[in-house]
Amino acid sequence: MSDLSWIYTYGFLGTRLFELPSLLICLLLIVIVGYKFKVPSNYQVVLALHCMLPFVLNDVMFSTSYMGDQFRYWEGVNAIRSGELGWVEALTGGDNVFQASAMLALLPFPAPVSPISLGFYNTFLYIVLFFILYVKNIFTKVSIWFYLLFPSMALYTALSLRETLILFFMVLTVVYARESKILKSILFIIPLYLIKFQNFFILAPIVLMYFIFNVAKKGMGLAKAVTISLISLAGLLLAAPIAIPQINHFRAAMFVEDGGKAEEIMLISGAGEFVVEGLTSGVYFLSKPFLWEANGLLPLIQSFENLFVLAILFLITRKAWMKSPDNLAFWLLFMALSMSVYGLVVFNYGTAVRYRYPLVMIYVLFVCADCDIRTLFSNKQRPNKQCPNQELPNNSLFPKINQ
């Protein structure tokens, strides 16, 4: 692989000057698409501010090596763009770093000259996803501001990582499932299998249930949700002899990867412990790191963020329970499944935040959309039909993207 270190000879400011074309692409996307679909200027301003984040994260807020896998994606995209690694070879080779790099290499950007370059690639995906959700009328006032201001999302969508791709494919899989467009939903969940198979196995049964129970039109129903939960619990108990060794393997691997010693990890020894650990670790995974567990500036910031996010989740869930418990039940199943799966195997606080934010974002987006959550505090019931003077787009006035 060719030497990429030449960029460091240009210093801090020189490195960032090379990224100005990428910044311009992102800003032009906001201006052109925002103008076409008459997106309110306050949303466009926040998106434009997001475009500046790649400049002020790596080697400003923290060292690039703090999340060292950024170098691997940077090198992977460069290898593909330079022809040292074939695109098909990267996509089919089995290494999910190269598979994610192959997908990023398709984006209309200059070659990534520094580790911060892919932050603009991911910012581009973040902006594209925003406009798709906006034009498809997925957003409510609550979810649109959560999307724009969620700190973890702002952080990870501006770094040179695969997390934005994961979020992008997961959200669009659900979007097309809600529209009963099976082929498009499958099209977006397949790349997810390549770059993050855990999320694929979390999302696939959820999407399948969405189609089977016609959740978009009928909701899940509390009785169905309880029945599915009991069946799932029974299935876990029956599968315990097979599942426990695999879970222990991943628990140990993740613990060692995060700097622990294999002999210090507490392994799951029985079916009862498996179920209890899954339930309790799911709640802990959603909440950590707590303030007293934070060790360093970034974990401390993330612990304060957790308090805010948990409060928002509580308010959204409470309002959804009051308005549409049948629709809420489905997304509570999604949240319980996803948090429990990762809670069993993830120990590092930073890793937990990184893996958790796409799942939290999906919950907020689609609980607000399916339960029509437009405010967190008012008890007044609003009709589903939007008012003519509402900020968000009306389907009768705006064309839709990728329908």
Regions found by a protein language model. Name each.
Residues 28-33, 120-139, 311-315:
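Transmembrane-helix motifs of polytopic, lipid-linked glycan transferases
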Residues 39-41, 130-151:
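Transmembrane-helix signature of polytopic, membrane-embedded enzymes
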Residues 67-71, 192-193, 201-323:
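Alpha-helical transmembrane segments and terminal signal-anchor/GPI-anchor hydrophobic tails
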Residues 68-113, 280-281, 285:
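Short hydrophobic/aromatic helix or loop-helix immediately within or flanking a transmembrane segment
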Residues 110-128, 303:
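Loop-to-helix entry region of an early transmembrane alpha helix in multi-pass inner-membrane enzymes
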Residues 121-124, 145-149, 153-171, 195, ...:
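Multi-pass, polyprenyl lipid-linked donor-dependent membrane glycosyltransferases
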Residues 133-138, 171-184:
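Membrane-interface transmembrane helices that cradle and orient dolichyl/undecaprenyl
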Residues 135-141, 179, 220, 314-334:
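Membrane-interface helix-loop-helix junctions at transmembrane boundaries of multi-pass membrane enzymes
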